[in-house]
Amino acid sequence: MEIRKRKGKQVGRLTVTDKQHQEDLQRLRLLRPIDDDFMRCLFKDNIPLAEFVLRIITDKPDLIITECETQKDMKRLAGARSICLDAYGTDSVGKKYDLEVQRQDKGADPHRARYHSSVMDIENLHSGQEFKELPDTYTIFIIEKDFYGQGEAVYPIERINLATGKSFEDGEHILYVNGEYRGDSAMGKLMYDFNCTKADDMNFELMANRTRYLKENPKGVSEMCKIMEDMRSESLKEVALRMLSAGKYALEEIANISGLSLDEVKKLKAERSA
């Protein structure tokens, strides 16, 4: 914080950084598990919580999760569109789970679910392997609203043989979870928790404890603020890179519009040209 003297007294004046920090703290207070930025932090290095949530959603009480990554970058084919998974887990028998939260229906388009599922296939079949070695995959979209409007807690999407009416059994599973669902069941309580801003209002201890850490513990708050600062920085860089790609802006203009320093813009240009 900058301090200026005025008639013998010190008067505090917030810098831009201080103002942003205060805005971040306010934003943090309003974040819920159904917000993807917060959800990724909830699940980061937290296999017990991921396992607990997946057990409820998949209705597999004996599910054992052995690995869980957040913001898993998936791009195995050159030129293909990359995606970053909110939470990517593996269970004790090798099945894969992609857990996503979507605030808006457009983010849950069925084609997106199809692509997420296909990307997991590409990620998990290596050269020389047989197709039958593909692991079962679960693409799970938790959507803030009831995407299909039928009041169900979960909408399982499975391929079937239309001629026989039997399951295709290709190991691909897509689940749309209704974020509006409420009730006394574990799923109803879980969706309630996903929409809570306060840990004290939550039903489940694992969810509440992690939320309390990220929102109330100084170390957790610092972690969240650092993540929000990094995201803001990445957003500024994206603006600058688009302007550099346009090729019609002076570096000083890019710095002024993007909010980056001139040195940062020069560095981006050098990296882009390398």
What are these regions, as identified by a protein language model?
Residues M1-H173, G183-S185:
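Accessory alpha/beta interaction modules
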Residues Y176:
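Short hydrophobic beta-strand segments that form the core of ligand-binding sensory/regulatory domains
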